[in-house]
Design a protein with these regions (language model features):
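C-terminal structural cap/anchor segments
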Residues: 127-181
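Signature for the C-terminal beta-barrel architecture of outer-membrane proteins
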Residues: 2-138, 143-147
């Protein structure tokens, strides 16, 4: 389904900007795609470089700003990078990191504090039209190494419940919920 929004846009051959108010009638408590937010985006082409910038103010997540650039260095090579800093972000966290079975989905929505997302990458396309893309990224909204270790340990122990006369559907449900990570 779509999202209700109001939008103003301008563009020409080298520049574009947008101002968007998404979910203008939604209450402040809404999260994720239902959050009311005001966002601005700008694009500028300068020779072989595309520059992007944005700012967003969400009712629930607060302020977010970012910038990106893409440079077509040659006919075969393109380099790109982006950075985003945010006041808050919606994410998920497990309320059950142990070996016990859950009676409901342990992966619950949570609001994170300030953080950032960074991406650096490039692509190469040879004359034979075979391409290679390489990217490195950092994302503060991602689960931590400790949370992934808990997730792995929980996945390993959940099948052992099948030998304890636990209904297979309960074990299957818990394993399926692990997919929410």
């Amino acid at each position: 389904t779509g999202r209700p929004l109001l939008m103003a846009e301008h563009f020409d051959a080298d520049t574009a900007w947008s101002l968007v108010w998404v979910n203008p009638l939604e209450p402040q408590a809404n999260t994720g795609g239902q959050e009311a937010a005001l966002a601005a985006r700008v694009y500028q082409r300068a020779g072989a470089v595309d520059w992007h910038g944005f700012a967003r103010q969400g009712e629930h997540t607060g302020t977010s700003v970012g910038a990106a650039a893409s440079w077509v260095a040659t006919d075969a090579i393109e380099l790109h990078a982006s950075v985003r800093a945010y006041q808050h972000a919606d994410s998920i966290r497990s309320t059950n990191t142990g070996a016990s079975l859950s009676t409901g989905n342990p992966w619950q929505a949570t609001r994170l504090g300030a953080g950032q997302q960074i991406l650096v990458g490039g692509s190469w396309t040879g004359e034979s039209q075979i391409g290679l893309m390489v990217e490195a990224w950092h994302d503060d909204t991602a689960l931590s190494d400790a949370q992934w270790r808990d997730w792995t340990a929980r996945n390993a122990v959940l099948p052992t419940w099948l030998s304890r006369r636990v209904p297979p559907a309960a074990v299957a449900g818990n394993l399926a919920w692990q997919g929410n990570a």
